[in-house]
């Protein structure tokens, strides 16, 4: 399993940005004792978003994503969201939505042997990244076939919500932002219309939240909206809070949920047995 740090000049953000990439390029077959090589069409790819206060290193340091991605033959791309909620910000060169939904897949596919097929391209995230997953996974549904949102911070547009993390510096006035596609509710309505018109295929959703998490009610509310609209939604909950123990468990479940097929057992560091 290769863990690669990339720094590239983002046209959208107009600066150099860091990205971590997990690439299962060094898997050695037990049968041939040689590298397996790139699958036909390239590696299926998960774009994985961190939460507030985090960066592109969070998922590697907080979970066992490397082990599970290697086992599944899955490439994982982890950008930095810079507390920007993965939306078009107020400042110039701050459209983090277009960065995640358009530019990042295109650039990563030019650098690495990643599949360009929608059915092999997925997006997931936690907390702020869960919001970014829902908003951008729906907005760019022509790119992403499966969305997985953990403990999603989708409470910004609740009139009873008190801003605690400087959200208005990114969204602007929340009442006004709620009327635009910065809101996942607006993008949800747009997606329903696009699917009904046959313009895009509906993505599949995984949503989850810890039962001890204060974000549970708003996540249940949005889950029910998706189900009522006829979307394919898998829901999961565990007796946990807003923490890495929950997200570590969830990312393994989601990798198992994704349409990846059966991966062959391979030889690797610390993994020398066929009995996997």
PLM features: what roles do these ranges have?
Residues 1-276:
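Non-catalytic cap/lid and distal C-terminal segments of serine-dependent acyl enzymes
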